[in-house]
């Protein structure tokens, strides 16, 4: 289905928050990073960043540069099968690089942080046991911290700290506010043109209750409301675009909070 470009619905960018002062970017020495892993100085590389900051592409480039690396996803919605366009899986971008923790539970279920932490621990151990370098990549702050900071949410469900990384090297992907706004708007147009509405209609037709799709938020929340006739197309577009911009700001706020807690993030500008 061909849809008109709706970016002009947001001429003044209402509701888009300003981003705090950007961190100073670095240039990383990739061979030195690979050697640090081989020497045991680090046991996980984590590539994080807000939505539309190029983190997946950067992680794939990094994996190729290292040569024997695999990617573990830290995305709270890419775990669901059949939720492809709205979550931006872009699986073709991985090419020959193996990936994990994507498409592991059916759409309609409600995967929780305890399940993710356990699945990550298993995948991380498997990658290391095969002599490969694990690269965690994503923008879900709670998922990242559950994997890298040995969070034990409760005594019954939390994974023991010894099963999780102890020496993570964090890399953050940076884009300017102007570029972030442009990327998010362009990507939303592309997803609508690529069949986002049809994907969500298909999920509803498969028997997944609308309230479950609303629970997933962002694309699944607002497009479901449009499909159900509760929003016009223009209302859906404006609300969704602004929600994604707000979400990107919250992600960056989370990562800067990690820094205030003592986490060193090496910020880079992805090519």
Where are these regions (language model features)?
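Short, conserved catalytic or adaptor-binding loops enriched in Gly and charged residues
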Residues: 91-96, 160-165, 258-260
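Phosphate/Mg2+-binding loops and adjacent switch elements
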Residues: 127-185, 189-193
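Noncatalytic linker/hinge segments flanking ATPase motor cores
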Residues: 109-120, 141-146, 210-217, 243, ...
């Amino acid at each position: 289905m061909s849809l008109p470009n709706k970016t002009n619905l947001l001429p003044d960018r209402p509701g888009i928050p300003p981003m705090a002062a950007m961190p100073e970017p670095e240039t990383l020495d990739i061979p030195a990073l690979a050697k640090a892993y081989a020497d045991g100085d680090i046991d996980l590389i984590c590539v994080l960043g807000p939505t539309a900051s190029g983190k997946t592409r950067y992680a794939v480039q990094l994996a190729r540069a290292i040569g024997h690396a695999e990617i573990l996803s830290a995305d709270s919605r890419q775990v669901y099968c059949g939720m492809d366009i709205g979550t931006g899986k872009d699986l073709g971008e991985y090419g020959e690089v193996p990936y994990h923790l994507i498409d592991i539970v059916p759409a309609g279920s409600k995967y929780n942080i305890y399940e993710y932490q356990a699945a990550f621990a298993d995948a991380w151990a498997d990658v290391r046991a095969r002599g490969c370098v694990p690269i965690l990549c994503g923008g879900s702050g709670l998922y990242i911290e559950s994997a890298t900071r040995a969070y034990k949410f409760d005594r019954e469900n939390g994974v023991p700290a010894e099963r999780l990384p102890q020496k993570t090297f964090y890399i953050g992907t940076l884009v300017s506010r102007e570029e972030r706004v442009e990327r998010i708007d362009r990507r939303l147009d592309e997803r609508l043109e690529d069949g986002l509405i049809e994907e969500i209609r298909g999920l509803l037709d498969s028997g997944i209750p609308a309230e479950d799709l609303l629970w997933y938020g962002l694309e699944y929340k607002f497009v479901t409301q449009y499909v159900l006739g509760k929003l016009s197309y223009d209302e859906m577009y404006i609300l969704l675009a602004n929600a994604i911009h707000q979400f990107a700001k919250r992600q960056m706020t989370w990562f800067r909070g990690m820094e205030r807690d003592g986490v060193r993030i090496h910020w880079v500008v992805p090519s």
